[in-house]
A protein has these predicted regions:
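Transmembrane helical elements of multi-pass membrane transporters/channels
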Residues: 30-49, 150, 161, 184, ...
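Transmembrane alpha-helix boundary and packing residues in multipass membrane permease domains
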Residues: 35, 39, 50-51, 68, ...
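Helix-terminus/linker motif at the lipid-water interface of multi-pass membrane proteins
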Residues: 44-62, 131-138, 194-201, 259, ...
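Small-residue-rich hydrophobic transmembrane alpha-helices
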Residues: 61-121, 158-177, 273, 286-350, ...
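Short runs within selected transmembrane alpha-helices of multi-pass transporters and secretion channels
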Residues: 82, 86, 150-169, 177-188, ...
Length: 461
């Protein structure tokens, strides 16, 4: 009856069966591991992708780098829009109301495609001006413009990829999105090789490679979620489509705080770069490489966070508040334990991690120091990552977004600016570690107070 033990345990949530601590941990691990592997493979493929583009030369790399933060921001807005609906789907699935879960999915497709088409029109309209607004010169702006135009045209497929992935995760299927995440990365590398090296299309080829990867993977992903999944299969419903305004209103309540957070956090990253820039080229390179190396260490946190969102969403929808709290505490505890271990690994092997990225001794020494400072904050970084995912699963996004923004702008950037004057890049990373520790503590306070449970109710839809 069940494909695997994870399916049986997910069914236990909806059927009201009691679950032992061992079963809960097995379920968390079963949902987390595929997502962790997908996160890590995505980072690795990103490195390979960046290396391929880097071989085009400095101008090509700069032209893509110029608008890279903008493309990430747009992608995060589409992801936030998808989350507003996927949280509701998880709640309805937990409540065993599969019909309404599919209704929400239909609304998500309509609203999300409309939103992505609007962003496409905006992107097409500004693609010629954006590189100059970002400070690009005449030598790279034309290439940046073409790259951004091609990316803008594929935004509906970017949304379809995100919404399909999130809907499957909401239904408890972590394996398919994880496989698709690996496939889209591999496709990106293959198409980039084809367009960049075989067809000699340069920067335009890099954009076409990304576009083709999204096109080729988003459609199968959509078919699996909307036509093949036993819970979400939209062909099961025979009644005509009916517009339900409350689904959209609740999606906005969840998505808008996340979107605002993404915009302001992107701005904070830009300010952080501006603080590091005057410290010199060695500091800039060490900062960049340390961030890259650290990203491999916190991927497990995001994988466990994906599991937390699904489990909290379904148990919250099922009205099993005690089980909801139990999963929240267990996922946060597991995340902190795993990332504490990763922190130890990062502290011990920091020289080797930076050495892989740069052979320059001065960069290696400074980057190693940065990683060792950050290692002490990893458990609290995990607390913030997983607790935020818990809150999102419960539909609680306003106050968590305020915590993220408040600590970033009021603590990290303020401290980084002050400490950089006396301690250089070391001061910037001390500020980062201090802020992550404080952020983690604030999220833990919110977790144990339980106010995240009161923010959203399925029966209010």
């Amino acid at each position: 009856l069940f494909k695997n033990k994870t399916d049986y345990l997910m069914e236990s949530i909806r059927k009201g069966r009691a679950m032992t601590r061992r079963e809960k941990l097995n379920l968390i691990v079963g949902l987390s591991v595929p997502s962790m592997l997908a996160q890590i493979s995505t980072v690795m493929m990103f490195f390979i992708d960046a290396s391929m583009v880097g071989h085009l030369g400095a101008e090509a790399s700069a032209s893509i780098g110029l608008i890279e933060s903008t493309t990430w921001l747009i992608g995060s807005l589409l992801s936030a829009a998808a989350t507003g609906f996927s949280v509701q789907v998880a709640h309805f699935i937990g409540a065993n109301d599969f019909r309404r879960a599919r209704q929400v999915y239909r609304h998500a497709l309509i609203c999300g495609l409309a939103f992505s088409l609007m962003l496409t029109l905006v992107g097409v309209g500004i693609h010629g001006y954006l590189p100059y607004w970002l400070g690009g010169g005449d030598d790279i702006a034309p290439y940046s413009s073409k790259y951004f135009l091609i990316y803008s045209l594929v935004l509906p497929f970017v949304f379809l990829y995100h919404i399909s992935e999130m809907m499957l995760k909401s239904a408890g299927n972590m394996h398919t999105p994880s496989v698709m995440a690996v496939l889209i990365c591999i496709s990106d590398v293959v198409f980039n090789y084809l367009f960049i090296y075989i067809l000699k299309m340069g920067v335009v080829g890099a954009a076409c490679g990304t576009a083709m990867a999204y096109f080729c993977i988003s459609l199968p992903n959509l078919w699996i979620s909307a036509c093949s999944n036993k819970i979400l299969n939209l062909r099961q419903d025979k009644e005509p489509f009916r517009w339900v305004k409350s689904y959209v209103n609740h999606a906005c309540q969840i998505s808008i705080p996340m979107a605002i957070q993404n915009i302001l956090m992107s701005g904070a990253q830009i300010v952080s770069t501006m603080i590091v820039a005057p410290l010199g080229n060695i500091a800039i390179a060490a900062h960049s490489f340390a961030i890259t190396a650290e990203s491999l260490c916190y991927m497990p946190g995001y994988g466990i966070g994906d599991a937390a969102s699904t489990l909290v969403g379904q148990t919250h929808g099922a009205g099993r508040i005690d089980l909801c709290k139990s999963f929240a505490y267990l996922t946060v505890g597991l995340g902190m334990s795993v990332m504490a271990l990763m922190g130890v690994v990062m502290f011990v092997f920091a020289p080797e991690m930076i050495g892989v990225l740069s052979p320059v001794e001065s960069i290696r020494e400074l980057g190693t120091l940065c990683l060792r400072i950050e290692a002490f904050a990893e458990p609290f970084f995990a607390a913030s990552i997983v607790t935020y995912s818990v809150c999102v699963g419960a539909g609680d996004t306003k106050k968590p977004a305020a915590i993220n923004l408040g600590t970033m702008w009021l603590v990290r950037l303020t401290l980084a600016y002050g400490l950089s004057k006396s301690y250089g890049l070391e001061g910037v990373w001390i500020a980062m570690a201090t802020e992550l520790t404080l952020r983690g503590c604030l999220f833990l306070v919110r977790l144990f107070r339980g106010s995240w449970l009161k923010s959203f109710r399925v029966d209010s839809l």
